[in-house]
Design a protein with these regions (language model features):
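Cyclophilin-like peptidyl-prolyl cis-trans isomerases
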Residues: 4-10, 18-199
Length: 199
């Protein structure tokens, strides 16, 4: 009887260990790109940044970003708002040379419903900018330059930087002016966005 009890306890312990191992593998795989996971290379006059999208948590947002990139909507726009240690923001058509309207006030002419999720806003995370209305995102996006956990579950995180952190740092270190101290003194232009697939 005693031996049977020990065997049962051993079996339970092994099952628990396997379950934990399985859970850990799932957690690790969650951050690994699946075959064909879409990526984009944001080409700028400061260098390239490659981002990997998260269609599993923000499908509409990812589709919208890809659509606008294919339409060359972002080409010639700029990172018009830069706050070191917080984020760099771009994607506004009003930031293009010769455009009417103030940078930061433009969009594609429609809004995308928010897809708030459990992905943390940490350095390198790609997220959508918006107005006070949670469903007012359009084309403007930002790349976190530091921890911005106060944005978690309030802004749509939809991807992360997988290369080009040195470019992010270079842009974030540009001297800025203005009331908020976020207007770059040098133009950081998005020359194009190239869509690729993870291998």
């Amino acid at each position: 009887m005693k031996n049977l009890r020990l065997c049962l306890l051993s079996a339970v312990a092994i099952m628990a260990a396997l379950t934990l191992s399985s859970c850990n593998n799932k957690e690790q795989m969650k951050d690994s790109p699946a075959a064909g996971t879409p990526r984009a290379i944001i080409h700028t006059n400061y260098g390239d940044m490659t981002v990997e999208f998260w269609p599993d948590v923000a499908p509409r947002t990812v589709d919208n970003f890809i659509k606008l990139s294919r339409e060359k909507f972002y080409d010639g726009s700029a990172f018009h708002r830069v706050i070191k240690g917080f984020m760099i923001q771009g994607g506004c058509p009003n930031s293009k040379v010769g455009a009417r309207g103030a940078p930061g006030t433009g969009g594609p002419g429609y809004m995308v419903k928010g897809e708030f999720n459990n992905r943390a806003h940490v350095k390198g995370v790609l997220s959508m900018a918006r107005a006070s209305d949670p469903d007012s995102a359009g084309s403007q996006f930002f790349v976190c330059h530091g921890d911005a956990s106060f944005l978690n579950n309030k802004y749509t995180a939809f991807g992360k930087l997988v290369s080009g952190e040195e470019v992010l740092n270079k842009i974030a270190n540009i001297r800025c002016v203005g009331m908020e101290g976020s207007t770059p003194t040098e133009r950081v232009e998005i020359t194009s966005i190239e869509l690729v697939e993870a291998k």
